[in-house]
């Protein structure tokens, strides 16, 4: 016996160590996988993308800088060529101005020589005019002398000599007059030329001053261009130095990238080694765990079967409770109907109060029985779950935990609606969530001619089924509760809007009638749930009864959900039984 206890303690100790080892292996595996995931999915792609982006940006910046500096160099060379051309033009203009300046410097000498020549001509003209005057005086004197002495006193020789002298004097005077006219023309021309030369000299002086100003302006511009060229050359040298530094930085980054690639390869190798070790350890751990996993699964299967049996028994109890509440409501409705139809007596009141007391006693008895059964069931499921948890220990198997939670939660969720008393149980409401898009939206006019129409079965209504359903309807009286009166409506939407909640809170102080709001838009009506009225229920019970099988029931519900015309935003008030029966009997 002692050996068995020692073996059990050793087995428990070994199992605990094995679970701790499996947990540590699992934790190491998770950490390694997390490190691998972080490195492979975040660090290395981020670094690689950053390096590629930096290399791309650097190459683009380098190309852009090279292009810009080439453009600047080209523009500077063009400017230098333009400056050279302008310098050549300035030199040629300077030479021309020097020639013109030399000409203007020789102009005063020419003017003085011309002035002397003009004075000489004036003197000569004065002497010739004096000679002409003397000849005229002589001519006039001779004429006077001839008139005084007479022609007969003179000899022929003297007369001829005087005539010849007069002729020669006339010729001289004519010649002198011609020369005088020529000299006057020459003097006038010289004066005009002198005026023209003086104006040219003034223009030359003005041009010389303007050329000097242009020369000074061009000199200053040339100095500014030389300064700009020097500054641009300095900037070009700085940019070339920066390009060289960028090249060195790129080489350093490439070296770092190679080092990181090597480190990544080493990390991958380490990860592969860890994976191999992990697979070996996990294989051993799986071999150890598979032996115990079978027993755990068997215990869980037994516990699940037990919980299913208990849930089935509980469902049967719930069904019996519902049937009992239905019968009580049926008797109560029949009693109230008979009291209203016949005379109201105190005996009937006493009978009604006794029936109500009996119903309350039955409901309390069933409630206490169900609550005790629920406590017993919950304790059994909790003990079974504790046993399973103690057996599994800290193995870390998520699948076993999920199965235990499911087996424990199934009876609790199944018995949750039974907390209410049987007398307060309500019949299942017809309101619900938004109906899904049904395939019955396709009507006959839109179906293909070759396909089968599922609506055809609804037209084949046997008269026997109709009569049978009508006979069953006569014996069933489902009367609404006292709280669900005609002046109150039920909200079809499970989650009302805040505005409707505010309206309901405001209307609690004073009773008001909630009208049956009709929804006329097609899109809004499609979002509402179909409601089955009593006349439609007779038709569906005759065509597809509920007790013929699940297939007919689902077909009936699907057809009703798709084509029902009874759609409301709020549930309409219930009418009393036989309200619409006006007294005409029929086969139905």
From Swiss-Prot:
Its main location: nucleus. Residues 377-398, 417-525 are annotated as: Disordered. Basal levels in mitotically dividing cells (meristems), and high levels in endoreduplicating cells (stipules, trichomes) (at protein level). One of its GO terms (cellular component) is nucleus. It comes from the Eukaryota. It is found in: Nucleus. Residues 377-389, 465-484, 508-525 have a biased composition (Basic and acidic residues). Pfam families: SAE2. One of its GO terms (biological process) is gamete generation. InterPro entries: Ctp1_C, RBBP8-like. Residues 64-104, 164-281 form a coiled coil. Seems to mediate cell cycle arrest before mitosis in response to DNA damage. Is probably also involved in the transition from mitosis to endoreduplication. PANTHER family: DNA ENDONUCLEASE ACTIVATOR CTP1 C-TERMINAL DOMAIN-CONTAINING PROTEIN, RETINOBLASTOMA BINDING PROTEIN 8. This is Protein gamma response 1. The lineage of its organism: Eukaryota, Viridiplantae, Streptophyta, Embryophyta, Tracheophyta.
